[in-house]
């Protein structure tokens, strides 16, 4: 698997990179890739999102071909976009989502934060609120989009929306919980070191896999 650090990149530019990679992965000409980056401030909404969850009519919201509702991305938030060939890994989207949650729970624990799943919801949570959101798109059994882990980012912008479609949803970050800045680079390295091994353990490549339709 290739891991690429894109630094800080506009949402639309990152989407174009994902689409190019996804086409290559589906065709068997590109390796699976984990993109790690930050976005300048931007609100995005998934395919099934409800515009009523945008509480401030003055904000610009970008539509994204992923699951989930409306969320906010900004500097200090680690965004991960794994471009993964689920067609070669058993075509189990539910398990893939649980892997992303497990990854983020383990990363949070490395920094001394206890995070967990919430029944019936996607993402990870703490006693102080939601720590990370997950929204995935799949085309020809190749994944796009992924997760956003709050590290040092401002939390006030989340007040302009119902995050992930949840009314009065408290949002927190690693730094807010710990009461000190958490270096984003350290979190990035933890994610990059853990993800390939966790994915191969939980969703290994099949010896024979159907080609993408």
From Swiss-Prot:
Q: Give the reactions, separated by semicolons, that this protein catalyses.
A: octanoyl-[ACP] + L-lysyl-[protein] = N(6)-octanoyl-L-lysyl-[protein] + holo-[ACP] + H(+)
Which parts of the sequence bind substrate?
A: 66-73, 133-135, 146-148
Pathway of action? Protein modification; protein lipoylation via endogenous pathway; protein N(6)-(lipoyl)lysine from octanoyl-[acyl-carrier-protein]: step 1/2
Q: Where are the transmembrane segments?
A: none
- Which residues are annotated as site, described as Lowers pKa of active site Cys? 130
Gene Ontology molecular function: any one: lipoyl(octanoyl) transferase activity
Q: What is its EC number?
A: 2.3.1.181
The BPL/LPL catalytic domain extends over 28-203
Assigned GO CC terms: cytoplasm
Q: So where's the catalytic machinery, residue-wise?
A: 164 (acyl-thioester intermediate)
Q: Which keywords describe this protein according to UniProt?
A: Acyltransferase, Cytoplasm, Transferase
Against NCBIfam families, the record matches this protein to: lipB, PRK14345.1
Q: Cite any additional comment in the entry.
A: In the reaction, the free carboxyl group of octanoic acid is attached via an amide linkage to the epsilon-amino group of a specific lysine residue of lipoyl domains of lipoate-dependent enzymes.
Q: What is this protein called?
A: Octanoyltransferase
Q: Which organism is it from?
A: Geobacter metallireducens (strain ATCC 53774 / DSM 7210 / GS-15)
The gene from which this protein is expressed is: lipB
């Amino acid at each position: 698997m290739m891991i690429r650090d894109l630094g800080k990149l506009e949402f639309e530019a990152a989407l174009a990179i994902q689409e190019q990679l996804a086409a290559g992965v589906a065709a068997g000409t590109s390796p699976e890739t984990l993109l790690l980056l930050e976005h300048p401030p931007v609100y995005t909404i998934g395919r099934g999102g409800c515009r009523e969850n945008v509480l401030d009519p003055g904000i610009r919201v970008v539509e994204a071909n992923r699951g989930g509702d409306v969320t906010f991305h900004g500097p200090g938030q680690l965004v991960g976009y794994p471009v993964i060939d689920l067609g070669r890994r058993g075509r189990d989207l539910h398990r893939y989502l649980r892997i992303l949650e497990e990854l983020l729970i383990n990363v949070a624990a490395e920094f001394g934060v206890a995070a967990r799943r919430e029944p019936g919801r996607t993402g990870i949570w703490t006693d102080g609120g939601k720590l990370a959101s997950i929204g995935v798109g799949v085309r020809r059994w190749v994944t796009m989009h992924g997760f956003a882990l709050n590290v040092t980012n401002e939390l006030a912008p989340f007040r302009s929306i119902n995050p992930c479609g949840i009314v009065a949803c408290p949002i927190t970050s690693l730094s807010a919980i710990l009461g000190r800045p958490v270096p984003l680079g350290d979190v990035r390295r933890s994610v990059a070191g853990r993800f390939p091994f966790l994915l191969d353990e939980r969703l290994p490549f099949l010896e024979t896999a159907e080609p993408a339709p």
